[in-house]
Amino acid sequence: MKAYTYIEKGKFALIDKPKPELQEATDAIVRVTLGSICSSDLHIKHGSVPRAVPGITVGHEMVGVVEEVGADVKGVKVGDRVTVNVETFCGECFYCRHGYVNNCTSPHGGWALGCRIDGGQTDYVRVPVASQGLNRIPDSVTDEQALFVGDVLATGFWAARISEITPDDTVLIVGAGPTGICTLICAMLKRPKRIIVCEPSEERRAFVKEHYPDVLLTTPDACEEFVKQHCDHGGADRVLEVAGAKNTFQLAWRCARPNAFVTVVALYDAPQILPLPDMYGKNLTFKTGGVDGCDCEEVLRLIEQGKIDTTPLITHRFPLDRIEEAYRIFENKEDGVIKIAVYN
């Protein structure tokens, strides 16, 4: 089978690999029907993910059909359409029991697929601890509707949840890339008083304006003053930093009112500075960390009910044998791309 593979820093390639086999009784083999490219894949390509293992098949956003299950797998069966969770987690350790599955202490725990073990930009993938990592897709939900459940949408849902958004809040979302838009969609479920999105790209601001017309829009240069003008208490009540650009962390906390929550969703290629002398007196609460992807079943229900729709994010579609072209478009942000669906 063909598999898009991390060869070395700066180089991915589509190569031949054998079809995976069950290794443990808790494994499942999934035939990938649809996948996508994530910015985290680009972080691997450029050497920003030290734990990524050269030689692995990349890709952690995928849906598919269960082809084979180990003897101990529960909850899914052969023939089920499923989402695949970006996080591999045992469900039994201290962190899993408390809902912090990103910190699972099992050998497979955390981000394994497409990072430490073979992922989903291929025809078949072995999913460890499949009882936890697979969720059955409702019959009325299409593959494209479910495509982002296991990662980028789970990230947005997690970010909105831990931000403790209330109906009285003004929410600032920094960044309107794929994760930022998924975060916006999930923040809207909380029905805050207003949402402001800060995004430098005119194309992406236009996308937000078209699909989410009630959202207020600004740019990084104008953001601080814009937030002051549109907030009741001199700053945003909740700030979700989803951009991960050079100065966006600083922008996020500066735009927060005293005693606000700042949730850092983004990944950074370089360390960020926390200027405590400048921040003294703001009494901010910071929340950080990787997605705790334990909400996938609930997210699928919301999609089934028509309360979440991420299909507008899919701007391009490519077959697996053209994945190099798809990566070029995604990495260079060409042709108005937001997300790319890769089909088999």
Regions found by a protein language model. Give the residues of each.
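C-terminal hydrophobic helical "lid"/dimerization subdomain
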Residues: P200, E225-F226, Q250-R254, G293-N344
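Cysteine-cluster motifs in flexible loop/terminal segments that predominantly coordinate metals
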Residues: C38, N85-N135, D139
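Residue-level recognition of short, solvent-exposed, well-ordered loop/turn junctions
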Residues: Q23-A25, K77, T166, R257, ...
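Local beta-strand N-terminus motif with an aromatic residue
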Residues: G79, D168, P213-D214, G235-A236, ...
